[in-house]
């Protein structure tokens, strides 16, 4: 896109700044509604570890909110323990578990409770000839070793040595002790020093095939730990997200980014409406009435002008889930709210694809319509949930 500048309000960490009032060539003008300081954008590179990068970013933002200061925590320290937990689960399930690189926020919390955490400078998780993460070969070897154990119906001492050596080779040896800012820690004592309680962080979802205000395990492959989540009506899920962001609590988001309306390159994610012209404004309707549906979509996906979006109901959302159109592709970090010149709400979203893949510092804005349709679940601190909703959930 040949834009001189695409401004996405709040699309920046506490170390970057672009005015929300500047206008981009494509016609999007964003104004801040809520903006929370967070740490810098990282790059998961050639790995399927978005779940860890998003959750780590979320936790780092929590430490900022708590007045603990700025931390750069090691994603790969957590990823390594997640792989260990997957291997255990897969073996107990007779090889029917999940050994992929993906996961969800619960895997981060469990790993943190089990082994603690270390700073990135202590364990960067790259022990091979690269300056970026790449787990393709690592994951292939992991699967091969796991398959042998399943075939033999036994995990020998050599099996455990092979696994440890595999991770040491690709990710580096785990530190028993380390010094950080002049003080000696173990991974567990460093985790304790942060003052975090994983029980404070709540997963919330919204689907109609399960009762509201009760917990269930969303049926997505990356929920291999079968984590129970609270089920809310869709409007209340959005209410939680808004309330949290407006009160200084960021939100970790899991959802579908496979749609054409999701454009990291253009810094936006939208959910165009091309059928119900009667719901459009006069200007939009006059413009879209001259086109067929295909042309309307093509126009919307140029990202050169604002377009009307789908009014997403619980039924529309559920249809996407049950037709497997909506999947748990990706986790990201919601760090604020902006509105465009028409007053449409968007969520400021910190991605983990580095800062070079778009001109907005690695951020984008996802419209409310897109978020309503494509969210699988969110993670938020319990104090970021409105009191009336907490009461309904018994939290």
Residues of each region from the PLM?
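Bacterial Sec-dependent N-terminal signal peptides
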Residues: 1-23
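A broadly tuned, weak detector of single residues within folded domains
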Residues: 3-6, 13, 43, 105, ...
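N-terminal, helix-rich and Lys/Arg-enriched segments in bacterial and organellar proteins
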Residues: 5-6, 12, 47, 51, ...
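Short, glycine/serine-rich, charged loops/turns that create anion-binding
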Residues: 12, 57, 257-258
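A generic secondary-structure boundary signal that marks alpha-helix termini
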Residues: 16, 59-60, 343
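Short, positively charged
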Residues: 22-27, 309
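Active-site nucleophile-adjacent alpha helix/oxyanion-hole segment immediately C-terminal to the catalytic cysteine
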Residues: 25-212, 216-254, 358
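Active-site signature of cysteine proteases
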Residues: 161-168, 172-395
């Amino acid at each position: 896109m040949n834009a001189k500048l695409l401004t996405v309000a709040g699309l920046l960490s506490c170390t970057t700044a672009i005015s929300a009032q500047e206008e981009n060539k494509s016609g999007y003008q964003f104004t801040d509604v809520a903006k929370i300081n967070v740490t810098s954008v990282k790059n998961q590179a050639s790995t399927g570890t978005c779940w860890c990068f998003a959750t780590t970013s979320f936790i780092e933002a929590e430490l900022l909110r708590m007045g603990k200061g700025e931390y750069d925590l090691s994603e790969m320290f957590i990823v390594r323990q997640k792989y260990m937990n997957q291997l255990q689960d897969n073996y107990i399930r007779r090889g029917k578990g999940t050994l992929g690189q993906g996961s969800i926020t619960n895997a981060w919390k469990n790993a943190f409770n089990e082994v603690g955490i270390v700073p990135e400078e202590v364990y960067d998780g790259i022990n091979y000839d690269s300056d970026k993460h790449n787990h393709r070969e690592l994951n292939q070897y992991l699967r091969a070793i796991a398959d042998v154990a399943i075939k033999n119906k036994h995990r020998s001492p050599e099996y455990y040595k092979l696994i440890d050596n595999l991770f040491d080779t690709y990710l580096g040896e785990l530190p028993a002790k380390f010094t950080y800012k002049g003080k000696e820690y173990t991974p567990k004592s460093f985790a304790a020093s942060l003052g975090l309680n994983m029980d404070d962080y709540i997963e919330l979802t919204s689907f109609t095939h399960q009762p509201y205000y009760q917990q269930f395990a969303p049926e997505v492959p990356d929920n291999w730990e079968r984590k129970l989540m609270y089920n809310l009506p869709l409007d209340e899920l959005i209410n939680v997200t808004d309330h949290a962001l407006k009160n200084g609590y960021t939100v970790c988001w899991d959802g579908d980014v496979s749609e054409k309306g999701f454009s990291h390159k253009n810094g936006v994610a939208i959910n165009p409406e091309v059928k119900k012209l009667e719901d459009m404004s006069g200007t939009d309707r006059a413009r879209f009435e001259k086109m067929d549906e295909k042309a309307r979509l093509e126009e919307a996906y140029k990202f050169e002008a604002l377009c009307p979006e789908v009014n997403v109901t619980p039924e529309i959302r559920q249809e996407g889930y049950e037709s497997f159109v909506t999947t748990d592709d990706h986790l990201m970090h919601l760090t604020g709210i902006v509105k465009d010149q028409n007053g449409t709400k968007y969520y400021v979203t910190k991605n983990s694809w580095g800062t070079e893949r778009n001109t907005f510092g690695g951020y984008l804005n996802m419209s409310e319509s897109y978020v309503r349709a494509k969210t699988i679940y969110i993670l938020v601190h319990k104090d970021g949930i409105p009191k009336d909703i907490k009461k309904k959930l018994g939290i």
